[in-house]
Amino acid sequence: MILVIDVGNTNCTVGVYKEQKLLRHWRMTTDRHRTSDELGMTVLNFFSYANLTPSDIQGIIISSVVPPIMHAMETMCVRYFNIRPLIVGPGIKTGLNLKVDNPREIGSDRIVNAVAASEEYGTPVIVVDFGTATTFCYIDEAGVYQGGAIAPGIMISTEALYNRAAKLPRVDIAESSQIIGKSTVASMQAGIFYGFIGQCEGIIAEMKKQSNTSPVVVATGGLARMITEKSSAVDILDPFLTLKGLELLYRRNKPTTEK
């Protein structure tokens, strides 16, 4: 079995794969102040609930966009699983040709998503990840990662509206059936919801126009379902795209990582 860990700015997603099949997955809050023991106890609790043990795991791979948590995360893997994890970063074999100004600055989550989408759905492909930031990645028909766009995520934008507009309340992110709100809260929720649908559709349309292609559009991330259910711009919703990419990258780099 393989343990895959996706460390995002808001949440960490943990999954267990066996023979390329996702058996279990869990989510925990990303806290850069957690110790390796706290991380270990959390993961072991997940395992206990699923009747798994650390000895079931033969390899671990981690993607992280939060550098401060990585020392504790790597220490946890060694201490509780006796495995030195494979880290997605420079030197890892991805199979992608990165045609960007500085490949090292691309977030590992974007690389993982691009690998998974290209393998699973073919190219050209646009990957939209609705996370703390909303990212759009374009991989051309030759499988070349051409770059993309990064926009503030829906949660960041919602919180900024509350923090910077004195008379506006904090609101929950919710699907709105009416674009014309009858109250301040309803108006904010409508603006946030339909605004992000418009952002998503506009960026995708412009990417298609500038690339002069008709790529398949794949969405992932915690808030993807709510947005994509109302948008015709997205072809495929894949909530486990990042975990799939991690498992695939582990197999591509397996000879040097498995215990």
UniProtKB/Swiss-Prot annotation:
Keyword Lipid metabolism recorded: no
Cofactor: NH4(+); K(+)
EC number(s) from the headed UniProt entry: 2.7.1.33
Compartments reported by the entry: Cytoplasm
Active site: 109 (proton acceptor)
Principal EC category: transferase
Biological processes, Gene Ontology terms: coenzyme A biosynthetic process
Keyword presence, Acetylation: no
Pathway noted in the entry: Cofactor biosynthesis; coenzyme A biosynthesis; CoA from (R)-pantothenate: step 1/5
Chain sites annotated for binding K(+): 129
Binding locations of ATP: 6-13, 132
InterPro entries for this protein: ATPase_NBD, Type_III_PanK
Cofactor binding: number and manner: A monovalent cation. Ammonium or potassium.
Role noted for this protein: Catalyzes the phosphorylation of pantothenate (Pan), the first step in CoA biosynthesis.
Subunit: Homodimer.
Protein family (similarity comment): Belongs to the type III pantothenate kinase family.
NCBIfam families named in the record: baf, PRK13318.1-1, PRK13318.1-5, PRK13318.1-6, PRK13321.1
UniProt name for this protein: Type III pantothenate kinase
Organism whose genome encodes this protein: Listeria innocua serovar 6a (strain ATCC BAA-680 / CLIP 11262)
Lineage: Bacteria, Bacillati, Bacillota, Bacilli, Bacillales
